[in-house]
Amino acid sequence: MELQQKTKTDTNGLIPPYGGELKNLIIKDKNLKNDLISKATYEFECSERNACDVELLMVGAFSPLEGFMDEKNYNSVIKNNRNSNGLLFGLPIVFDSNNEKVKAGETILLTYKKQKIAVLEVSSKWEPDKSLEAELCYGTNSLDHPAVKMIFNERGRFYIGGRVYGFELPIRQFPCKTPEEVRSTLPSNHDVVAFQCRNPIHRAHYELFTNALLSDNVSSNSVVLVHPTCGPTQQDDIPGKVRYLTYKELEEEISDERIKWAFLPYSMHMAGPREALQHMIIRRNYGCTHFIIGRDMAGCKSSATGEDFYGPYDAQNFANKCSDELMMQTVPSKNLVYTKEKGYITAEEAKEFNYEIMKLSGTEFRKKLRNGEPIPEWFAFKSVVDVLRNS
């Protein structure tokens, strides 16, 4: 654990980045950039998932990593949840390819939609045991799990590890603040609670993350960082651009100084407990001290049977085990319901006082959305509904 930062805050009064230093892999020297490009042995076009990982490496969101994991670190992470230096890590960060010729010592120019974003200096190339990776990281080999399907059907035959030299961030339809930029907006010496989501935010979500600021383990005058992922998710999820527009509309509508907004170019794996750990590491690098953990966080169902791959509290329990070492606290999400008498309260309180609970299922919501039917404002913000309908 030698790399684990000992102090509570960095020089700006914020929690230190994971491993003690926020990595910035972007090369500013134009001559060095041109030299790296001219000497590159290969040029590979990144998938959208690859591009997300390259960007998060470049800006330090995956600190303390300075590039894609080599075979030693990959094996350590999938087997032990730790890299070879002993630091906790949830999922391996690797670059995949079907190129048989690439070897250690060579360099690869990485492009995304023809934009030259980075050079990868190859230190390791191997053919992974994908069945083992799937079983250890996702708890299953079933292709009904979206990430397992991705590993076998989308990723290349080989994994490549090595140092990344960044040039420029991928041009996106929506701006994603870097950890350094987010940290500059956070208050010193106050708790910062992270809220992760991958879908449009509705009333229950809002009540959830604002109530989190009142939790016993969260200090007064704290803020919440609403930090949605806008990279690839599941096939049936709403596209990232549309999600981004709903968040921007809601940010303007709420206009609450306790709530900070930023967007994360992260590719979801739906890995349950492992992904909860990954999200906590990333959010610590963005300056967060607390992380809201909901029921079945980053979970998914079998596309064949409809059964959950993880238990409802697997992610919560695993995150709690890791929290002390990560220097981050978890904030369990309350089971909130909307009642006719009291508005949003806990399900336990509603049951105790026999209040009338109002319900609207996701299926019913989507049907009303398609048919132009009124959607109750206790369920969804009008601004969010308008964006979803217009898209």
Where do the protein language model's features map onto the residues?
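Active-site cores that bind ATP or allylic diphosphates and position pyrophosphate for catalysis
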Residues: 2-391
